[in-house]
């Protein structure tokens, strides 16, 4: 008996590294030292920082993977993975530098996992960060054949004096929403339950989605906010705080970027729920409060700016191609958002 007969194909693993080498190289940026294949990745910190602080984050894409497996589409999952990590560290005011991935599978399917890495590389290029390395684990008996899981790790850099930790947020500041691209990568256990109970499948198309299949709608990749936020910082738009709206929706995530005894009064009339959320609520008979506590509801990122910079910030983000609007105002409170169902 040998290792391959036990379910682990080392030769296929080597070939896979060759398959993705050019994808990894396509993400190369200043600071990367060496290439793929070492025991660790090397990155030289950029000059020009007085007190550089490294900011790190890790995440996955949850059960959105189940839909990718059922539909057989894997090219967008990597974008989700990068976005979930870099959007998180972005909220601290950090510029993403590099990214690492972990792929675990029951049996190495080179074509399938190359598609995943294509998405990771695309997300890294869009975010200006290098895919510095990763790990691919073949784990027979742990995952079913054809199934895989992914995790990502992002590292960024910020000037210590410019870190966003809630202390800069002031009463009277305004909360500006940047639109999400859809459900992003949270709430998919509920999404899958709604679709299963509806008797539909992922190939079903709905008139409300203009002929798109449910698979296409719910595999829409998570939006990356790195470019517009770094551009805003370069233009000296004063950002006091940011929140990435992920699991737990606005109620869970927006208070994380505020200071003590602060909350946000939300203007529910300031935006209309995107179609995908209206469909989920109706199809699943989901209460409004549950929708807001589970999904982003069309708000992917919230940027807190002083009231005097509201018009400037809105104009700038719209010029960057973002759908942006004033979501609410920072007021006195205990962190419980005001105005939500």
From Swiss-Prot:
EC number(s) reported in the record: 6.3.3.1
InterPro entries in alphabetical order: PurM-like_C_dom, PurM-like_C_sf, PurM-like_N, PurM-like_N_sf, PurM_cligase
An MF annotation (GO) of this entry: ATP binding
Keywords, comma-separated and alphabetical: ATP-binding, Cytoplasm, Ligase, Nucleotide-binding, Purine biosynthesis
Location (main, coarse): cytoplasm
Assigned GO CC terms: cytosol
Leading EC class: ligase
Pfam families in the cross-refs: AIRS (PF00586), AIRS_C (PF02769)
Pathway listed: Purine metabolism; IMP biosynthesis via de novo pathway; 5-amino-1-(5-phospho-D-ribosyl)imidazole from N(2)-formyl-N(1)-(5-phospho-D-ribosyl)glycinamide: step 2/2
Protein's name according to its UniProt entry: Phosphoribosylformylglycinamidine cyclo-ligase
Organism field: Synechococcus elongatus (strain ATCC 33912 / PCC 7942 / FACHB-805) (Anacystis nidulans R2)
